[in-house]
Amino acid sequence: MFWDRDADKGRCAAGGGHNAQGFMFVLPSNRPETAVGQTAWRYCRKCRGIYFNGFDTHGVCPGGGAHGRLRPNADGSRTDPNYLLNHDLPEGETATSQRTWFFCRKCFGLFYGGFPSQGVCAAGGGHDREGSFEFMLAHAPVASTGFGDDNVAIPVNE
């Protein structure tokens, strides 16, 4: 999952910039964590993807090294969104939501696991979802591109 509203498409683990396909997801931000909503998901300034920032380490970024948050303001404060991702919800998908999104325990990125291939991981090989929640993400009610719904764009601020 990556930010797609600028000319810069970030760095994809498969090489080059990200290629958007599918839905435009809308991620809630700066809300409290709940029993079915996990916070500490951040935007990476290097690869332009979403990664989990809840551990002491920050995974492996396709842009090199570990993922990195937006830089702090001059006064040291931070204004980058802290995304809340809903998980393990009992209801099924709707016309404006999609399940089968997972945390990769190797790169710490968020990836779509609804295809036989689990995608290319920046840490090598395919993504590994062992131990991950199954996330369900809300999206705008737009038609699919016909290429699958595995790459998306997100708003940095909601």
Model features per residue range: what roles?
Residues 1-158:
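Trp/Gly-enriched beta-strand/coil motifs that build multi-repeat beta-propeller-like domains
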